[in-house]
């Protein structure tokens, strides 16, 4: 189910140029599909713990899946870009309820402990982000509506699978308040990780959402490019990240990965008209992102003396802000200046994340 949920993030990516052409929209207008999705996802993270502690993890997962099925289907039946933007916001609400609860559920039911559960979660993220664009490209070559209906069907399958196969999990003894994630951000270690992730996500989503407009490829071709990116992300998140963490430590490896991601974005910015370089840089970035995602997710769980779901919700609330702003701003920067500029700004944002992480290193001795 997690794989399918994360497929929804990358599924729309290959069809962004198609939607722009067929609905007569500008790149920045089309990028609002990601902005509304990420903004609502981030804001909704505040309430996910409160919902889960009242109706239980299993029913929270099912509610999130139901909303994704509903709004993805509505997105496929939309007639203009404004409608799709609103439906993507509803999709983001379902996504928040699902992914915030899914990590906690995987930790509770997996047999390999927290570290093993996080690797499983990141593997699902990588597989979803690789298969999503591939499926989106194939369905998008038929119609831009295809990927929306495809997600709706797949999430309906996930809904049935969780309903049947996931055992009922007990509700937390203590009900979570909507203010608990905000209170958790008082812990400087967690706040440091969240602010770093906000800046890192700015670069991540600049790469994910604006490179389709730079490449000018068909939906199928874009699908294969991001499939390669997602496969590399999945491999490094599962097999490479744990080894690097043991060898160089969490913070040391994270500094390095952030620096490499910033350089990668800079290379894309300098070579936006060289499609071979851009494609290679996108796929290589997947490797850096995979390592970083695993390390950062693990560190967040150890950065503050609060329950894991609360730490995850607080962290996600902040970090998705970067994911919400980047797509729209990338389109605007390209319109105002040139297609090079969004990647320069993305590189600067990720580099700033290194400075934020270094400034809060004294609060991260436990990670």
Language model features with spans:
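Helix-loop-helix hairpin linking two adjacent transmembrane segments in secondary transporters
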Residues: 119-164
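Juxtamembrane intracellular "pre-TM" segments in multi-pass secondary transporters
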Residues: 167-194
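Helix-to-loop junctions at the C-terminal end of transmembrane segments
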Residues: 45-56, 236-250, 334
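Cytoplasmic helix-loop-helix junction between adjacent transmembrane helices
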Residues: 87-127
């Amino acid at each position: 189910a997690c794989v399918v949920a994360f497929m929804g993030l990358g599924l729309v990516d290959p069809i962004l140029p198609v939607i722009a052409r067929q609905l007569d929209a500008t790149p920045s207008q089309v990028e609002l599909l990601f902005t509304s999705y990420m903004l609502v996802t981030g804001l909704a993270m505040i309430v996910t713990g409160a919902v889960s502690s009242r109706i239980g993890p299993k029913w929270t997962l099912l509610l999130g899946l139901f909303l994704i099925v509903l709004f993805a289907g509505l997105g496929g039946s939309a007639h203009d870009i404004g409608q799709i933007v609103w439906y993507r916001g509803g999709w983001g609400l379902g996504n928040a309820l699902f992914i915030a609860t899914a990590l906690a559920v995987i930790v509770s039911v997996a047999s390999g402990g927290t570290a093993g559960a996080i690797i499983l979660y990141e593997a699902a993220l990588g597989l979803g982000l690789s298969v999503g664009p591939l499926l989106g490209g194939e369905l998008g070559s038929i119609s831009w509506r295809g990927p929306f209906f495809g997600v709706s069907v797949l999430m309906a399958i996930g809904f049935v699978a969780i309903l049947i196969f996931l055992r009922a999990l007990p509700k937390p003894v203590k009900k979570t308040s909507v203010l608990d994630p905000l209170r958790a951000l008082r812990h400087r270690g967690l706040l440091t990780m969240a602010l770093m992730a906000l800046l890192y996500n700015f670069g991540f989503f600049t790469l994910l959402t604006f490179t389709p407009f730079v490449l000018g490829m068909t939906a199928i071709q874009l699908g294969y490019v991001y499939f390669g990116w997602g496969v590399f992300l999945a491999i490094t998140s599962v097999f490479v990240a744990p080894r690097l963490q043991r060898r160089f430590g969490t913070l040391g490896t994270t500094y390095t990965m952030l620096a490499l991601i910033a350089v990668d974005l800079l290379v894309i910015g300098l070579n936006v008209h060289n499609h071979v370089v851009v494609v290679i840089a996108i796929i290589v970035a997947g490797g850096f992102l995979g390592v970083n995602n695993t390390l950062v997710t693990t560190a967040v769980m150890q950065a503050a003396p609060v329950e894991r779901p609360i730490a995850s919700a607080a962290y996600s609330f902040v970090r998705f802000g970067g994911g919400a702003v980047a797509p729209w701003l990338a389109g605007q920067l390209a319109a105002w200046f040139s297609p090079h500029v969004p990647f320069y700004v993305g590189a600067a944002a990720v580099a700033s994340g290194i400075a934020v992480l270094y400034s809060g290193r004294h609060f991260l001795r436990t990670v």
